[in-house]
């Protein structure tokens, strides 16, 4: 089971938390859920250069708090805070009128061991026509500088423009997928190359 299931959802309530934290009445649940999706879609689409790894949405009554985990906070804040003001205005338009919005930016101090950012890095390398083995090796070397116990990276598709799609993976160290108390970070990404879409999966064991 641990080999197939998403490692993050498998560990919810043990050492992982939901990315949205709120309660709602049944009649308003779907509307709030759709708001959350609109917020995430807007931020990930319009702040591609900001290297955002996680968006945490907390709600309490009409208070909405966004926590943006990013390795490049300056891109979001902008010059003299113009970027964050613009973001606040645009996100507020996606919320109901009575909602009060607060945005907190949390700096990701070590992006090399963040699965989302590492998967995005590999995708960017593949899109710029770097060979998949070189892209994966570069990502592993960056992660290993932080002395993590293990990392696994898998890429699937028409690798290096091959006629037949295949799956390749490389693992360094231990990645215990079935140990529930293991602190595993996991992310997926897609690289849109001229030969087709290449899927990227990253598992990082942090201890």
UniProtKB/Swiss-Prot annotation:
<dbReference type="Pfam" id="PF07650">
    <property type="entry name" value="KH_2"/>
</dbReference>
<keyword id="KW-0150">Chloroplast</keyword>
<dbReference type="InterPro" id="IPR005704">
    <property type="entry name" value="Ribosomal_uS3_bac-typ"/>
</dbReference>
<protein>
    <recommendedName>
        <fullName>Small ribosomal subunit protein uS3c</fullName>
    </recommendedName>
</protein>
<dbReference type="GO" id="GO:0009507">
    <property type="term" value="C:chloroplast"/>
</dbReference>
<dbReference type="GO" id="GO:0019843">
    <property type="term" value="F:rRNA binding"/>
</dbReference>
<dbReference type="Pfam" id="PF00189">
    <property type="entry name" value="Ribosomal_S3_C"/>
</dbReference>
<dbReference type="InterPro" id="IPR036419">
    <property type="entry name" value="Ribosomal_S3_C_sf"/>
</dbReference>
<keyword id="KW-0687">Ribonucleoprotein</keyword>
<dbReference type="GO" id="GO:0003735">
    <property type="term" value="F:structural constituent of ribosome"/>
</dbReference>
<dbReference type="GO" id="GO:0022627">
    <property type="term" value="C:cytosolic small ribosomal subunit"/>
</dbReference>
<dbReference type="InterPro" id="IPR009019">
    <property type="entry name" value="KH_sf_prok-type"/>
</dbReference>
<dbReference type="InterPro" id="IPR004044">
    <property type="entry name" value="KH_dom_type_2"/>
</dbReference>
<keyword id="KW-0699">rRNA-binding</keyword>
<dbReference type="InterPro" id="IPR001351">
    <property type="entry name" value="Ribosomal_uS3_C"/>
</dbReference>
<comment type="subunit">
    <text>Part of the 30S ribosomal subunit.</text>
</comment>
<dbReference type="GO" id="GO:0006412">
    <property type="term" value="P:translation"/>
</dbReference>
<keyword id="KW-0694">RNA-binding</keyword>
<dbReference type="InterPro" id="IPR015946">
    <property type="entry name" value="KH_dom-like_a/b"/>
</dbReference>
<keyword id="KW-0689">Ribosomal protein</keyword>
<comment type="similarity">
    <text>Belongs to the universal ribosomal protein uS3 family.</text>
</comment>
<feature type="domain" description="KH type-2">
    <location>
        <begin position="39"/>
        <end position="109"/>
    </location>
</feature>
<dbReference type="InterPro" id="IPR018280">
    <property type="entry name" value="Ribosomal_uS3_CS"/>
</dbReference>
<keyword id="KW-0934">Plastid</keyword>
